Amino acid sequence: MATPALSGQKVAVLPLTLAVPDLALSSDTLLSVRAKVLPWADSLVLEALTGRAPEVTWVGPRELRRAARRATGLATDPDHMGHALLRDPLLKVVPDPLRSQIRTLVALVDARYALVPASAVFLKEANGNVKVELKLVIVDARTGVPAWRSIAVGSATTPAMALRAALAAVLPVAGVQ
């Protein structure tokens, strides 16, 4: 991720709304429960962003929810905007009404860009490790154009370590894994 280009700016981080474990992981007590895995993944994403890219002011999902509640009738709940559709790599412009919902929410926190964790897929590898594929998109809220997208991939013995590895791959810090 080109965080130097975002240096000194606020970037809204939308909550993850699509996390899917494969069948081999469906019995996992964390990954199989949507109400648990989504806030857990959000916290790891925000932890990685603030720790690995402190030059950007990241406005996390909790702050976005609070801003949306304060602007009832104006802003949409960030957990129910349907932004998982941004996982489609062929999407060149964010369609309405999602585009206007992102623009409104981002404006409420005085930002221009939104980082959208579009989806997280957890897979069991043949060696027993967990592999995660996290699709991330940065959207320019003014134009509705995805400015950057990536699939962060990580593999480790636990889902948390795999997600951290994926985030480390997309947010590299020299000399640190």
Named regions from a protein language model:
Residues 86-87, 94-98, 165-177:
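Compositionally biased, intrinsically disordered linkers/stalks adjacent to structured regions
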Residues 27-111:
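N-terminal segment of the mature soluble domain
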Residues 21, 39-43, 151:
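Hydrophobic structural segments
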